[in-house]
Amino acid sequence: MSASITDTTASSLPARLARLRGTAVAAPLGARGIEQSARTARCVRRQAITLAGLPPARVAERVGARERDQQSPFAIASGNLFEHAMGMSGAHQLLALYRAAGRLQPEECRVVDIHALPPSLRRAETLRLIGQKLDKRTTAPHLILQPHLAVRIAGRDEAIRPDLLVASDADACYSVGDIKSFADLDGRTSAASIRGAVRQVAVGVLALRAAVTSLGATDPERLVSARAEVVLRRRGAGRPSLRVIEQVDEVDIIARHIARAPALLAAVEAALPLGATLDDPDVVMALPYRYDADCREACPLAEACRRQAAAAGDPIIVGATGRRTLAAAESSTRALALLDDADAHGTADEDELAARLRAAERMLGEALHG
């Protein structure tokens, strides 16, 4: 018997994922793709795209969704310039930042930029340097810039590239850091931007724990701290500032999500018709989805999914509170029908909802017309 798209026993995970993609070419997920996937874990559509290794922005373009909040070329160039400046001249700005924060001593100044090596050597050199730290060698660097790590998800290694690893001589292992070019606004920095940076570092933490495990460590959770070291641009200047954020919950959430990848793949396969593949936009849009208001922060397909939710009368289009309030009716269309027809009878929950809606309508009328 030949294996089908729903035959989850006869094939390895990579083979099943290749069938899922069809003619589409897989692309790296990266830390950003993995953390966004964890935020949309209940959406079969997004999990299908992520597991198959398809770039969500490209899929969104094919199904007619505009990418939201694209950065201007100036913002992108400015961000790249800041991140590049942090690694220039022996990373002296980063060293000064960590010394000012009490994380490094003045004499702790060994820096290795992995990106300066030939691509074929970067992964091995990253592991070698981490091994030096685990062995307590005095040659271990204090800053490793652009380390090459990986996490295993759904049977394949996903490359993870944190901006930096940092450790003093007294530290047992490195902490993971991320450099962001948006300004540190003294506590008023966009919460969404900070959350995104922290979650990406959480993926880096898991990748570093995987690396130390591969080097023989038996207690990676103790060795590798869950804290996120986020380097921001100081307001009104090109100098950096440092935020250190504990993120145990984020690390645990993403770890559980990665562990669930095989089960998520089985759910995706079960939702697909026989022979259907994700290189067909119609197949993508026919998959079960769960649109929430925060999808716009985490998924390029949010606009297309919102259109579907609106067409289906899903109350989520008026917000999470609206969905909870209208839950008894299950759709905004049914809620309007209950409101418009005083003689309509449904379940006890629907009747209670109808009474609340009519009371709200009366109050609104009185407020508007006196």
Language-model segments: residues:
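Short cysteine clusters
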Residues: 43, 295-299, 305
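Short cysteine/histidine-rich zinc-coordinating motifs and their immediately flanking basic loops
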Residues: 308-318
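Acidic, Mg2+-coordinating catalytic module of metal-dependent nucleases/exonucleases
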Residues: 288, 292, 302-310
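Mg2+/Mn2+-dependent nuclease catalytic core
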Residues: 141, 147-258
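C-terminal non-catalytic accessory extensions
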Residues: 316-370
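Metal-dependent nuclease catalytic cores that hydrolyze phosphodiester bonds in DNA/RNA
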Residues: 1-167
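Polybasic (Lys/Arg-rich)
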Residues: 246-298
